[in-house]
C-alpha cells in the first residue's frame, strides 16, 4: 500500500496540474491503531479489520502555505470536483461505481484548462456514466448528450424544465454559451467546430482504448 501510495501521489499531482491546479499538494496518509488484542507487527500489537491494519486517508492542500487537510473537508465544489476527476481518471477501470456526477467542475477555469477537463470527463465516461453540470462550452461540447436546464414561472410558481437538445439546438446553445445572449454567425461556426473537434477526440479515445485492450490481451497470451 505504501509503494502504491507513492505512485498515486505522483499521478494525482500530474493530473491536477493538467486540470489547472498546479499549486495543489496531494498526500496519502497511512496510519494504524494499536490494540492489545491485535496482531503483532514489528513488536507492536496492531488492530486488524477486514480491510487490513492500515488507516488510509487522502490529504490535500489547495493553496501555497496551507497545511494538508483531509480531502473530505475541501469546501470549494469546483476544487472538489476536479480532485475527484483526477482520481477517477487514474482509477477509472478499477472503480466499480456505475454513475458519477460532477457539479460546477468548471468553477474558476476556462479556455485550454476547461478543454482538458472536458477531455478527461470523456475518457472517464468510457467506463462509467458521467453526469456533468457545467456553464463551460468546452466541457458541454464533449458530452454525448446535451440537456438544457431552465427555470420557468407559470401561474406564480417556479418550475425547472429539462430539455434534451438535438444537433441544431445544441449548436445554438453552445453559441449562446460562447457569446452571451446574442447568437451570431461567428459563434455558430465556432460551436460547430467545437462539436466536430469533440467527435474526433472521442473517436481517438475509443481507438486508443481498443489498441490498449488488444495489447493487454496479446501480453496475456504471450505470458501463457
Predicted feature residues:
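C-terminal lobe/lid and adjacent interdomain/linker elements of RecA-like ASCE P-loop ATPase modules
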Residues: 56, 112-224
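Charged, surface-exposed helical/loop "interaction arms" that form contiguous linear patches used
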Residues: 1-37, 41-43
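Conserved D-loop-proximal element of ABC-family nucleotide-binding domains
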Residues: 69, 94-95, 107-115
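Flexible glycine-/small-residue-rich
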Residues: 28-32, 60-62, 87-89, 151, ...
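Walker B catalytic acidic pair
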Residues: 103-104
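Phosphate-binding glycine-rich loops of NTP-binding sites
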Residues: 15-18, 79-92, 119, 125, ...
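Short pre-catalytic strand/loop immediately N-terminal to key active-site residues, enriched for Gly-Thr
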Residues: 44-47, 68-75
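GG-anchored amphipathic helix commonly corresponding to the ABC/SMC/Rad50 NBD signature/C-loop
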Residues: 57-58, 62-64, 78-100
